[in-house]
Amino acid sequence: MSLSALLNNDDPVEDTKLYLESLNREMDRLIKRDQLELMYQDWKFANYQEFELISEWNTQCKELVGDGNDLQNNDLMTEEVHLDDLYDNIQRIRNEWKDYESYKETRSQLLSKSIQAKPIKHRRRRRTKLEMEAAANLAALSQMGTTDVKTPEIINDHGNRSKASRSDTTNKTDNTMAGINSPTSDVDSGHKDELDQTKLIKKQEASSSTNSAASVTASVANGIVEDQKDEAERTIEANRIGSNMQNSDQDTMDDLKKTNDPSSDIDSDANTSVNDGSDENLSNKLDSDDLHSEPADNEEEPVSSDAEKDQAENINQTDESEEEIIVKEYDDNNDEDFAPEIKKPKPNGKIVTINSDRPKIVRELIKLRNKGKAPKSSKRRYTAVNITEYSPTEKKISVKITLKQMHVKKLKKILQDARKAEEKRLQEEAKQIADQESPRKRRKIDRSENTKQEDEDDKEDDDLDGLPTYGMKMSLKDAKAIQRHYDNTYTMIWKDMARKDCMKISRLVQQIQSTRALNYKKTSSLCAREARKWQTRNFKQVKDFQTRARKGIREMANFWKKNEREERDLKKKAEREALELAKKEEEEKESKRQAKKLNFLLTQTELYSHFIGRKIKTSALEGNEVAEEDEDNYDLTTTAPNKNDFHAIDFDNENDEQLKLKAAQNASNALAETRAKAKAFDDAHRQQQSTESDDEEEMNFQNPTSLGEITIEQPKMLACTLKEYQLKGLNWLANLYDQGINGILADEMGLGKTVQSISVLAHLAEHHNIWGPFLVVTPASTLHNWVNEISKFVPQFKILPYWGSANDRKVLRKFWDRKNLRYSEKSPFHVMITSYQMVVADASYLQKMKWQYMILDEAQAIKSSQSSRWKNLLSFHCRNRLLLTGTPIQNNMQELWALLHFIMPSLFDSHDEFNEWFSRDIESHAEGNSSLNQQQLRRLHMILKPFMLRRIKKNVQSELGDKIEIDVMCDLTQRQTKLYQVLKSQMSSNYDAIENAAAEGSDIAGGGNSDQSIINAVMQFRKVCNHPDLFERADINSPFSFTSFGKTSSLISSSIATSGGLTETISELMYSSTNPINCAIPKLIYEDLILPNYNNSIDIMEKLLLSDFSIYDPVNNKEMCQYLGLLTGLAYGSFRKIHKSNYFERIINLKKESKQSSQNLITVVSNANDLIADSIVHADTNLPNLTGIRNDIYHNDYLNSIQPGYCPKVVAPPINFNVNGSLNFTNKMSSYLFNPVITTALSSIPPPTQYNMFVKKCIPIEEFPISEMYPNPLNKHFSSNISMPSMDRFITESAKLKKLDELLVELKKNDHRVLIYFQMTKMMDLMEEYLTYRQYNHIRLDGSSKLEDRRDLVHDWQTNPEIFIFLLSTRAGGLGINLTAADTVIFYDSDWNPTIDSQAMDRAHRLGQTKQVTVYRLLVRGTIEERMRDRAKQKEQVQQVVMEGKTKDTNIQTTHTRPEHEQLTPKSLSSEPEATNNLITVKN
């Protein structure tokens, strides 16, 4: 290798390493296949061991059979019987197997006869041709010299023959020998003629060359085998070849050694390998045939001679000796080594069983033992492998393989045997042909015919599907066999190479590499030594120079890298700064453009509003006098109207003056369009009724400056007196109508917006003779209120209530007059009142009418610009629109824009612009995120003033009482806390989103884009705060009654009521319920067994209790009986008699005696008749009431609080017993249960019976039978097994209800009347149960109440002071109704929208209210309700900013829960100490 290669580190060994790695991968693959082969051999060996065990068992069975005599001698007959059965079964199975073998043999014979490829005539023609060629060849043998033998043809022929010999291994020898002569008649000469021909061929063989004779024989044999495909003939040929395998010829091996053609070596080796396998199979077949064949027809065809038997034995010995050397080869598809699942070869014709001869069994076991041994593959088929050429660069290796000659040894013997047999046969056939056909001419004719037929046959045989024929004439089967043998040999060579020579080649390559590397090292060391010679002189200088050079190169590289990086960063920075600067300039430019756009729109709107407001003087009407602006505003009357397209204006180039002029032109144009619209509406009517124009006052649209000077008095037809501020509102509304402008009357709730709007309608009818048509749209809850108010204040108006069913509305539409734009006093109607629902339903009809004035009460119903209400009402044809609302802003500024766009679509046409002007700043300020821009707020008020009028109560109404708002904070109870925590844990990941949703409140309630699941979750949390029973109510518990109830109790009761006295049916009712189980006792058992024992036990017990242990027995207690006799005047032994009487009768008699004694005492004092009557009266009424006060308190406060601790699951009366056929038992049971004295004493006497006894029969009351002695239960809870839920527990389980219970007690005590608002109707149901329990008088109004019922409920509340509580739904009962009879408002749960609650509380705090109104709001601390309340305060602040122009502190008192012993009262709520920092604000 050159020095430059070493210095450049060129490694030529790299390619070698890659090649070796590929060889190693191939070796790993082969090793895995070898392991698989070893596993398969182990598996086979295990099977052979199992076979040995079975054979041993068979041997033991034979011994057992041989010992049968001993068993008989020992008289063990039972075991012999069992063995005989076993032998019979074995014999039966053996017979079945023999039948199956005979069936197989018959089937194989039929198949062999059916397989004949060519007809007999064709075979005869071909045989004639071959005989003539053989005769010509034999004649030339004597003249020809030594020629080469074409070994591959003979080998191929032999391979075909050997394969043919293997094809019939299951037929018997006698059958194969008998089938030799079956194909043709030429073989009938017998076996002796064949021996003679063999001797003749041997003599001729001495004078000819062995190689040429073999060649001729091979060619002839190839043709003969092709002609004779009979199975029996191939079997004989295979036996002959196998018998001569030991006599191999060395000359043939020498000829094979001299051949240099590698292909011939490979072919011969492949054929030899196949022949080895065929010889081994052939030897096994011969061995099995010798063991199992039976001679048949010995005279005609003997099986074999002695010499052939000896040769067969030698063949077997040779096969056994060479078994370890020869390795079986198959094709890859049938390779046993690599295909363990391959099928085993079919067994021989006869099977060795346990009944076979001992030598056969031994021989079979030896075969099995030999088969069990793993074949040794250490011997290979070639002598050596040498590497002739190895090129690492081309990845190529050349190997020279030297084959062993042991294969040729067998081949030579096979060739000799085949040659001898064929020569003998050909001579015989040639001789016969010569004798039969002597004429030469005829032979030539036949030859020509045969030649033509042969040419046709050759053409047929040439097509072998592209397989190699090696120049021979062979069949497709032989060609396939040759190709397979070639492939097997080639594959086996590579297998042996992979198994044996890979490691050796690998070691050789490694040795070459190590040698080469060593040479490289030596060379490099020599080069280094030579190089050091001239470096040693200045080594240090060179070393320093190299170090400095490396350092300089490194520093230079770092410098340039740093320089490039800095330049790149500077360039990026400059580009970024330029981009940011351009972006900033563009943003500034765009912001200026947007500012100019907004300023243009604002200026346009301000000019319009300022002009209208100056004429209408809204500020003066509101009571807020504002100084005149110094700003020079354009006069819209002198400014020429012009429509300037907003998008066509160049805001970049126009200056402020030009933009302001264009804004004034647009404002003037909007004013002109508004006037033109109103004028067109009036002109249409003027053209229609020109005759009435003189009587009407004309609207002055040409001189609008005089509109502000108009002062309107109260209409005379208005049947009420307007207050001063209401009269100002009337002037403002009339000016708006004259100007043709729509407006919003936004006075605070309770200031009379309804009466002001009615007064405008009266003003139009009285001064302008405009009687309609007027349209009033209100919520459903205020429809009757509007009808009552209009009919009350303006009786001249004809009202058309437009609601009801579809048919009713269809009838009402007949009163419409669509021809006249203005109605007169004689028109069918003047004012039509309907609801928002009816407007949406009948929008198509209402849009066809032209309305003079449309009033929308509670205009927050159209706060959403996306709703169908807003869109339908906007499309109505109206001269003027008036919106009545106490809360123009409820949630955000978008709702205000919806109202402004509804009244002035030309000015407020874009919500995005309005949002850009005001919404962002005001809403963010309300949330506390930014400061408020006062300039923006001033401009907003300037825009809103002309269109909206709003007065608050404290400015216009001094006589109205105060309003106090109090937030009552409660803590969750134990059950509520658990429920809240469970819900919170289930939604832990989304709890923050739920709280935010609760804060967004009305946006969700209004049907926003929030997730419905979050809304449901918020409602669940609110339910927990209200009451836990909203989820699940406590059940009523009662035991299962296993009872049969009486079905005629009603009839019995009626009979009692109609009877004149006591009847026996009274007692029957007590036992009307019986047990379904009836037990019947046999009479004999009852009388002979049960009754005597019972009587004896009763007698013994009575004797012990009444005699032996009794204190009233004179024998036991003589002294006490004497004293008692002296005191009572009874005889000495009377006490024992009394003591033995019935216990219940003694109790009844005792009560009679005590009653008589008290009566006697009273008779002594005064007149008997008077005193008895008085005592009875007083004893029944006054005296128990006075003397039983302590008992009542004891029962009410203590005993009623006691509840059963256990409720049985099942109750049942006693089982019914009766004795079959025993009247005595029935009578005793009836007398015991239905004793009239006892039953009458325990039960009560019915009132009709008492009346008959006292009045008709004149029985004194003191002589009435004793009754009602059955003891009363402890309290109401023990009177029945039915357990009702405790109302006390129902109250204490809710924190809100518990505080409400305390509050209502104080409110009831101080004669307050209460409105309670709810959000959930189900909570209202629970509240009704509570009020019923506390016996509070109440009424209820919710969304399910009908319109007629709502009117009656409101009337009852206003007129009946006995009603303490009015339960209302916030949405249904918070709009448009007057409930001034109440002075206390309680919000059990708050609404999403704070304005809804404000409207609800103003139902009481409004005109007509003379008392102070107190508002309580129940809230639960630490829950979603707190977040909702905080958000509501933010919304209220937005309203205050927009409406009043400033923010004010909302001081609402917040009270906390108190200890249990301290009650919550209104007085305590209003007198909280200042130390708590909770302020209370009085709102007017």
Curated annotation (Swiss-Prot):
Q: Which gene encodes it?
A: INO80
Question: Which protein are we looking at?
Answer: Chromatin-remodeling ATPase INO80
Compositional bias ranges of the Polar residues kind = 172-187, 241-250, 261-285, 1465-1484
Domain spans labelled Helicase C-terminal: 1299-1463
Q: Which domain of life is it from?
A: Eukaryota
Q: Name one GO cellular component term.
A: chromosome, telomeric region
Q: Where is this region: Disordered?
A: 149-193, 237-353, 426-466, 673-702, 1446-1484
Describe the reaction catalysed, as an equation. Answer: ATP + H2O = ADP + phosphate + H(+)
| Organism ancestry | Eukaryota, Fungi, Dikarya, Ascomycota, Saccharomycotina
Domain DBINO intervals: 493-618
- Name the keywords, alphabetized: Activator, ATP-binding, Coiled coil, DNA damage, DNA repair, DNA-binding, Hydrolase, Nucleotide-binding, Nucleus, Transcription, Transcription regulation
Bias (Basic and acidic residues) ranges: 155-171, 286-295, 426-439, 674-686
What remark about domains does the record contain?
The DBINO region is involved in binding to DNA.
Instruction: Give the residues the record marks as binding ATP.
Output: 747-754
InterPro entries xrefs: DBINO (IPR020838), DEXQc_INO80 (IPR031047), Helicase_ATP-bd (IPR014001), Helicase_C-like (IPR001650), INO80/SWR1_helicase (IPR050520), P-loop_NTPase (IPR027417), SNF2-like_sf (IPR038718), SNF2/RAD54-like_C (IPR049730)
Among the GO molecular function terms of this UniProt record, one is: DNA binding
Q: How does it assemble?
A: Component of the INO80 chromatin-remodeling complex.
